[in-house]
Structures are given as C-alpha cells and as structure tokens.
Amino acid sequence: MTDIHNHKILILDFGSQYTQLIARRVREVGVFCEIFPHDVAADFIKNYQAKGIILSGGPESVYDSDVKAPEIVFELGVPVLGICYGMQTMVMQHGGEVKGADQSEFGKAIINILNSTNNIFSNMEHEQLVWMSHSDKVTQTGEHFEIIASSTNAPVAAVAHKNKPFFGVQFHPETTHTENGKQIIENFVVNICGCDTLWNIENIIENDIKEIKQKVGTDKVILGLSGGVDSSVVAAILHQAIGDQLTCIFVDTGLLRLNEGDQVMQVFAEHMDINVIRINAKNRFLDALRGICDPEQKRKIIGKLFVDIFDEEAAKIENAKWLAQGTIYSDVIESAGNNQSKAHVIKSHHNVGGLPKEMKLKLLEPLRELFKDEVRKLGLGLGLPYNMLYRHPFPGPGLGVRILGEIKKEYVETLQKADAIFTEELYKHNLYHDVSQAFGVFLPVKSVGVVGDQRRYEYVIALRAVVSIDFMTATWANLPYDFLSLVSNRIVNEVKQVSRVVYDVTGKPPGTIEWE
C-alpha cells in the first residue's frame, strides 16, 4: 500500500489568516502537509522528516517582534519557502533588513519576474498578477539572497538564496487572487522539494480503511449520525472498513429540515445497508424547550439533551469499544490555536457529545487529517450523493435557532414547509450553489394579509441567503427580484400559517449569518 505520508511538507504558522489556505493548496497539488505553531520544538522539526518547510505570513512586524523562524529550519538542508512575514524573517535572519513600508499594500499587484531559472517561477510568464497584503518590506536582502521578482511598490517581491534552496515571496500565492499561485506552490513542492504526488482520494480511502481495520480489529464502534457532511462521510468510510461492527445512532430532534430524518434513513439504512438506530425524540426536545426564549439557553438545552439521549442509547450497545466522531483538520487546528497560535481564533471546536464520562470508549476520528473540501471529495469517492455532500451548512441546534423565541410544534412545522419551498426553488433555478447558505427564519409575530376577500392575521417568514468564502464575513445574496417574488407567493399560498415574507439584506458584520 502507498504511504501517503511519506513525502510531506511542514508549515510553520506565524498567525496569518491565510495559513490554512497554504495547506489546502499544497494538498491540491497532491502532497500531504501539516500546520504547526512557529515555536514548535526544534527536535520536533528535526524528527518530522519534512521534504520541505513553508513559513507562513503573520500580523507582526519582524523588526518589532522576537518571533523568528527556528534556526533548525535553515540547518536541515531541506528547501524553505517564506511567505510575506515568513520571507521577511528568513531574510532578516540571514543578515538582511526589513522596515515599515511608506504605504501599506493590500490588493492585487503586478510583479515582474527577473529570474525564473530552476526556482519557484519556473515555466511562468515574466508578468504575474499577485495578491499583496503587507505593511513592511525587505529593504536590504543581505549577501546571501538575490531578488528574483519585483513590483512598483515592492522592489523586493521575491528572493532566492544564492547557494541554498531557500525562497521567499512578499505576496500570497495561496490566495485565489494570485493568478498562478498554485503553479508557484507546485514548483516549490514538486520540483524543488521533490515530493511525489501521493495525496489523492483513492490513496486516502485505501489508507484510511487499512488504518481503521488495524486500530479497531473486531471491536464494535458507535457513531452519532446527524445527516451532516462529516458524520455521513465517517459512516461511509467505517462501513466500508468494518461493516456490521458499526452502529450509528441517529437522534431525531424534530428540529431538522423537512423530511430530513427520512432522507438520512433512506441513504444509510436502506441504500448503504448500514446499521442505524433512529431515536424519535421530538417530544422530549419540545418539552424541554417549552417556555424557553433565550437563544443561548436553547442551545444549551438542545446540546445537553442530545448528549443525554445519545448516551442512553450508546449504553445499550454491548461490547462497544470505540466512539467515532467527525472531527476534521480545521477543528484540530482551531483547538490547537486556543493554546498556541497567534491567529485570532473566532470560535473553539466542540464535537457534539464528546466522550461520555461513564463510558470507557476510545475515540476514533477517521477524518482528522482532512479539510472540509477533502471530506466532500472523500464522500463522493465512497458513493455518497452529491446533494448530501454539498448542502449548505446547518447549525447543530437545527431549527431551534431559526425560530426566534420559544419553540412550538406548529412553529417548527411552519418553518419546515417555508424553508423547503425556498430550497426547492433555489435548486430549480440553479441558484443553490451560487449562494453559500440559504434558509428561512420563523418570526413569532403576526402580520395582517389579504387572501381573496378574506383578511389573514398570520406569521412572518424571513428569507436569508448569503455569499461567503469562510463564513467569518458574508454579504447578502443579490437574488433576482422575480425569483424572490415567486418564492414569496408560493410560501404565502401554500403555507397557511404565513401571511408575509421578508428578505434579509444584512451583511456579516454587522449581522451574524444565523438570526440567533
């Protein structure tokens, strides 16, 4: 079997918002890589056996900070690529000079390649469109580095060491705004570091199945199945690896999208023949949420009850030794970031449930090394439906945070119907994948309306659709007026409890994507 980790790149994180993008670009080329804090122990770097090292960008100024690349990086004899701050600290640590730029540079720029012989610019045109994001600049390269690219505002746009395979760029090749950024990454990783492109979905599936079999043996495994992307892919890979040793527990909270519980059972229990226990807990959740209006309280109640029900059912499964979870690589990085990274962590990751205290279960995380886009590709490779893998994100508490205030059965049913109409029309008009997230929100206020000659006094539904790259920021989706009119008419005519539909035109910031 191919060792997909045999050729790997080590990325040292100096706190850039783009660090995960670097890793994703390296993996897109077909090479495994991992991200670690810049101050990780020298022995760790030495023993990691990387084929090459990438130094990320960062928010600090090199001349004001004691944050440097570990000297071991430059002593191992492996190729090094410094990006933005990474280039600046590398040059400075080799006798160069970095100063604050007269003017910060953020945005697109044209660089001129001065030397493309056997370096990161091999086989590229002399003019390149790149993405700059810096306030400092290299003013002196020192005796060891030469300039291999420049721009109007950044005379030192890229450098190469005269004797060693060390390269630096002032711009960000990892962003999509840098036109041929992937080529630069590929030149470094494949041509300069000499990595074989072993990281692909076929090899990952083969490797994961072998690892799961070796780890689990004949033990039984429990998985909390939600119907979301991560748990669905975990279910599929575990089923291929260990078959009937896997039992999935699907807690139907009653707060899912219309018919979602049935769809989950159809895909996994019927089509894939996976052992799924469906727990109808709708009434328990409604009872627990009665009279509760505060969003945080609702989240806590839903989360705790979910765990309690999962624990009850898991305890009934005899000889279970493992609890599988859908932890992915960005979760791992975020969790590490709370303790180690200089990047601003927006939220920490908490897998629903975690390890129940009274259960002596070992944790199994088959997706731990994969980014979300890789998880989706893995799911396709395992035969899961495209529409399941590329659905819009859905919050853990479900419709519980899309119904403002108290949650009642009639509110849930009303929102499910309205939301389903919105989603159906997005698909029909080929708009679903043009937006990053789209959903309905139930407002517990009544508004007067007229149908025929009759006055109606019913509830309001807000439609929300946003476009976002990372969900940290978002713009409201500029959906066609004719489309919104059609959706509104359908909802008011087909959902009797609704008399008015509004469209949310708030970005993030100042708003959040979800209403609660």
Swiss-Prot record:
Give the encoding gene's name.
guaA
Its biological function? Catalyzes the synthesis of GMP from XMP.
What Pfam families does the entry give? GATase, GMP_synt_C, NAD_synthase
Reaction(s) catalysed by this chain, per the record, are: XMP + L-glutamine + ATP + H2O = GMP + L-glutamate + AMP + diphosphate + 2 H(+)
List the pathway annotation: Purine metabolism; GMP biosynthesis; GMP from XMP (L-Gln route): step 1/1
Per its record, how is this protein called by name?
GMP synthase [glutamine-hydrolyzing]
Question: Which of UniProt's keywords are assigned here?
Answer: ATP-binding, Glutamine amidotransferase, GMP biosynthesis, Ligase, Nucleotide-binding, Purine biosynthesis
PROSITE patterns for the chain: GATASE_TYPE_1 (PS51273), GMPS_ATP_PPASE (PS51553)
The first-level EC class reads ligase
Q: Where is the GMPS ATP-PPase domain?
A: 199-391
Residue numbers binding ATP: S226, G227, G228, V229, D230, S231, S232
- Tell me where the transmembrane regions lie: none
Q: How does it assemble?
A: Homodimer.
Q: What EC number(s) has UniProt assigned to this enzyme?
A: 6.3.5.2
Q: Which residues form the Glutamine amidotransferase type-1 domain?
A: 8-198
A single GO cellular-component term from the record reads:
cytosol
What InterPro entries does the annotation carry?
Answer: Class_I_gatase-like, GATASE, GMP_synth_C, GMP_synth_GATase, GMP_synthase, GMPS_ATP_PPase_dom, NAD/GMP_synthase, Rossmann-like_a/b/a_fold
A molecular-function term among this protein's GO annotations: GMP synthase activity
Active site per UniProt: C84 (nucleophile), H172, E174
